[in-house]
Amino acid sequence: MATPVERMEPVPVSSRPGDGSPVADHNGARRRRLTGAQRQRSILYAAAEVFARRGYDGARIEEIAEAAGVSKGLIYEHFKGKRELYAHIRSKGTAESLDRVLEAAAAADADSRQQLEAALSAFLDFVAEQPLVWQVIEQEVSDPEINALMQSQQQRSEQAIAALLAADELMAAQDFDPEQIELLGVMINGAAVRAANWWLANPSVDRRQVLGPVMQFMWLGLEQIRLGAQLAD
């Protein structure tokens, strides 16, 4: 998925924006100007770092510009303001995360357990590779427009998980109401998100030590539901 947020790789902030052609610095050395796309990636990387550290309300365009090595005016050439910059990081990051999950599930064997494990593994990979973006995605903000965007993105993720559950033959055989499937999607998404947040707070824990317990927690319960198990009265 090609977006300016992808991998959030920083580009050298000492270079000036341009078309990629060589220029001379004050020592006469030849160096290459950054393209507009490269400069935008530099701004996004710096913004993600500042937002992750300061939060949306505490971040300032001046600080982002300084971190990116650009002027405030250059940021406004790419984004209307702080809200659009923040929303861009959140929306692109959420979309990339969900795309990875769905692609991994689709590429796995038809077995539902393997699909779930592949999807969860892809999600944890995203969080590990893009911790700054994930921290921004998970922040609480006071801006109503950002909150509305956050709610919409969360619902899209939950609905995508619910659609995968609904396509499972054993789940379909249980004749669940759509609302019940939707609720399962909410719970699975919530468990994955909480596990990812815990992992970021405990980075010394090996990825396999996160994936294993979370997978067991999700699958053992889900498998019983798929088989029609009921709690005794």
Label the model's feature ranges.
Residues 39-48, 64, 85, 89-101, ...:
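Generic hydrophobic, amphipathic alpha-helix propensity
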Residues 2-20, 176-198, 209-221:
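Hydrophobic alpha-helical segments that form the core
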Residues 1-38, 172, 176, 226-233:
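N-terminal intrinsically disordered/low-complexity leader segments
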Residues 95-99, 125, 145-171, 182-187, ...:
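Amphipathic alpha-helical packing segments from all-alpha helical-bundle domains
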